[in-house]
């Protein structure tokens, strides 16, 4: 069921991205934003590279945060973290009670993903989680007409669009994700690089 709620200009959003894949444990960083204007906090945890613990770790990180009760939405940079550690967005929504918006710069190449998953003994399980995330929709945010691609859990399309437009201030990628990416790569690599 999709949550229907009024989107306030200072809606509290948690954007989560992962760091560079340098070790067996991969850092994930969450930034708590009020709308797209300012950051209220930073969360950090670790997941297993190519593991299956991303959903559980995110749930724990969110529920144990002092920001949990203020948050209204979770934003993810895709559904695979730390290599092929797939996030079950339906479970993340169910366990945290927070709607989930997945943002992608480009539409995933499912043939390549399916092929890569053949190298995992539990590739079919991962594939089911990927397919369970639902339909990928194209959205033009108004920033240079550049499209982004989204998936969602627990939130309607109109609210997704409102939230993305509200938070996409400097690029087509919402600020909570853009800043989470900068922090995660900066901490891991010594300097931020790449695109969220």
Curated annotation (Swiss-Prot):
Cysteine pairings via disulfide bonds: none
Coiled coil: none
Pfam families (UniProt xref): DUF99 (PF01949)
Classification via InterPro entries: Endo_dU (IPR002802)
Family note: Belongs to the UPF0215 family.
Protein's UniProt name: UPF0215 protein MM_1007
Species: Methanosarcina mazei (strain ATCC BAA-159 / DSM 3647 / Goe1 / Go1 / JCM 11833 / OCM 88) (Methanosarcina frisia)
């Amino acid at each position: 069921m999709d949550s229907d709620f009024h989107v306030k200009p200072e809606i509290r959003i948690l954007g989560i991205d992962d760091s560079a894949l340098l070790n067996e444990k991969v850092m994930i960083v969450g930034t708590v934003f009020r709308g797209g204007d300012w950051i209220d906090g930073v969360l950090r945890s670790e997941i297993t590279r190519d593991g299956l613990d991303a959903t559980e770790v995110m749930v724990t990180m969110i529920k144990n945060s002092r920001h949990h009760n203020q948050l209204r939405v979770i934003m993810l940079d895709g559904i695979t973290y730390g290599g092929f550690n797939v996030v079950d967005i339906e479970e993340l929504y169910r366990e945290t009670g927070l709607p989930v918006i997945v943002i992608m710069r480009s539409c995933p190449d499912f043939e390549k993903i399916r092929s890569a998953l053949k190298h995992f003994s539990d590739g079919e399980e991962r594939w089911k989680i990927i397919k369970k995330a639902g339909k990928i929709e194209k959205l033009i945010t108004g920033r240079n007409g550049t499209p982004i691609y989204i998936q969602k859990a627990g939130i309607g399309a109109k609210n997704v669009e409102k939230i993305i437009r509200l938070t996409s201030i400097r690029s087509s990628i919402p600020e909570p994700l853009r800043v989470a990416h900068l922090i995660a790569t900066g901490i891991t690599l010594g300097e931020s690089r790449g695109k969220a």
